[in-house]
Amino acid sequence: MHRRRFLAGVAGLGAFGVAGCIDDTSAGAPGGTDPTDGVSTPTGTDGPGTPTATPLRTPTMTATPPETPPHDAPFPPGREDVDRVVWYREVSDPAGTTHLSYSTSSLSLPGEISLTLQNNADRQFMTNFYDWALYRWEGGRWRHVAPLFVNQPLMTLEPGESHTWTVTLGDENLETPAFRASGTHEVTVEPVGGGHYAFAVDGWWEDQDETPAHEHEAVYAARFEVEGPQLPLVPSSAVTATRREGDTVVVEAENPRGSDGTPATYVLTRDDAAPGPRELVTEQVYREWPLREALAHADGASEVRVETTTGITPLFGVHEEDNPAVTYDGETFRIGAEEREG
């Protein structure tokens, strides 16, 4: 199975709100070996519980997909509080219209793009400069990529003023265990693959007629193309060992957020009948740990067990009463969690 396609996304201009500060850097650090250099990692192929050395999988790198989003595609996904979406391509009078512009309509990986929100109205625009959003077009719809967590101050853009985000996109450092994208000016989002993307910000106008105002938001968006290979899904440097026990793959990993926590096992079980799975793309998977490790080892396995630690309650944030499940590359898996002895 070519681990590139779908996994279920989080919609909205900022998936989760948090009260604390979030910095502009990625969590975790690049490390480990390049997955294409032939270095081996312990894994089990000779029998149950027998670790052997096998080469790391070398993913197939393909070109930027030709699929182009139609102009009438629903956007942003999952937002019922949006009254109006203003695309930069639809602005005929930039000098007289509030809009989000870009420095380029296309870039190559790794690359940089600047996006500027210009308030050309005569009143304040109420917004949050942390609450930008990057979307990827894949599988016939827009999918939210970043950020997953958003600081929640209320900010304003005064009449005649502008605000610029400089966004760096990359496809390197794939073995970094955890990725975080945040910031109000300088933003890095990695890893991403080639394709069509959209950057968006939202807010509402001071003294607008609709009330409550925050339930009648305007979204300003710009679409651009990223040229580069498709993103492969590979394990991170947090993985210390793997072994195979029949149809089950066991992955041992160090939690990139620290080892202080409850010893636990993240369980991914193949189940095509699982109800209501989230459908994700690879760019989203890299931002969900340890799901990323489990899916990277799911080829040919009925179950993947990631043995690590977690500081989250419930374990790994898994609410098993909700029967969580994901779909990736056309295959569906149930998600579970078990406490284990340290």
Language-model region placement:
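Terminal disorder- and signal-encoded targeting elements
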Residues: M1-G342
